[in-house]
């Protein structure tokens, strides 16, 4: 039986040369749109990074849109995406649809200044870095030091892209911290709420 999360819509394009079927993500990629719509792990990061690099190669002067609806995930995978976003030549516009939580919030705020958006009913969420460890006490201590190191990296990224002080970022991310789209604008995580233009 096919599960709904494995169904990818197909789009038929007609031209003088006939019809051609594209999966929806390939069609979006042709329009320089990447969709991050799942938990962040190494496989998802590899796909997003490959798309970013491809679009950089295709046209280094044309913006890329990264739509985000993600609960976050693995920090190292998220940082790989973050570093690639900062490395490539095109400006990456980020758009939160639904929810951007944890690592996804870091990616959302890391978009090009002035091009970070959320839809009106989006939720943005921050918290401390999380992880787990087991084994000998010395192994657990090593793992704890590493997660604290990663947490410092994430906090510095948030400071850089929001303009907030380190003290405020530390305080606000100490526990679950939820923001509406408007609150995210005021916080500096995004620049604008996207609205449908009113008909005149």
Swiss-Prot record:
A biological process from GO: protein quality control for misfolded or incompletely synthesized proteins
GO cellular component terms attached to this protein's record: cytoplasm; endopeptidase Clp complex
Pfam families with a match to the protein in the record: CLP_protease
Catalyzed reaction equations: Hydrolysis of proteins to small peptides in the presence of ATP and magnesium. alpha-casein is the usual test substrate. In the absence of ATP, only oligopeptides shorter than five residues are hydrolyzed (such as succinyl-Leu-Tyr-|-NHMec, and Leu-Tyr-Leu-|-Tyr-Trp, in which cleavage of the -Tyr-|-Leu- and -Tyr-|-Trp bonds also occurs)
SUPFAM superfamilies membership: ClpP/crotonase (SSF52096)
Domain of life: Bacteria
Record bears the keyword Protein biosynthesis: no
Keyword Hydrolase: yes
Active-site residues, record numbering mapped to chain: 102 (nucleophile), 127
EC annotation from Swiss-Prot or TrEMBL: 3.4.21.92
Enzyme type, top EC level: hydrolase
Subcellular location: Cytoplasm
PANTHER family in the cross-refs: ATP-DEPENDENT CLP PROTEASE PROTEOLYTIC SUBUNIT (PTHR10381:SF70)
Protein family membership: Belongs to the peptidase S14 family.
Subunit text: Fourteen ClpP subunits assemble into 2 heptameric rings which stack back to back to give a disk-like structure with a central cavity, resembling the structure of eukaryotic proteasomes.
Protein name: ATP-dependent Clp protease proteolytic subunit
Native source organism of the sequence: Dehalococcoides mccartyi (strain ATCC BAA-2100 / JCM 16839 / KCTC 5957 / BAV1)
């Amino acid at each position: 039986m096919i599960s709904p999360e494995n169904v990818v819509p197909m789009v038929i394009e007609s031209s003088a040369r006939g019809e051609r079927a594209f999966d929806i993500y390939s069609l979006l990629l042709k329009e320089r749109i990447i969709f991050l719509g799942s938990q962040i792990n190494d496989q998802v990061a590899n796909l997003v990074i490959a798309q970013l690099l491809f679009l950089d190669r295709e046209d280094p002067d044309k913006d890329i849109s990264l739509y985000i609806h993600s609960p976050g995930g693995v920090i190292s995978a998220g940082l790989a995406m973050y570093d690639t976003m900062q490395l490539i030549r095109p400006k990456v516009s980020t758009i939160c649809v639904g929810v951007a939580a944890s690592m996804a919030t870091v990616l959302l705020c890391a978009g090009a200044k002035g091009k970070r958006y959320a839809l009106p009913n989006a939720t943005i969420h921050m918290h401390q870095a999380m992880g787990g460890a087991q084994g000998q006490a010395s192994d657990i201590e090593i793992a704890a030091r590493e997660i604290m190191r990663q947490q410092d990296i994430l906090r510095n990224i948030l400071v850089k892209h929001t303009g907030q002080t380190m003290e405020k970022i530390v305080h606000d991310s100490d526990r679950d911290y939820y923001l509406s789209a408007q609150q995210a604008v005021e916080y500096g995580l995004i620049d604008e709420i996207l609205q449908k233009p009113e008909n005149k």
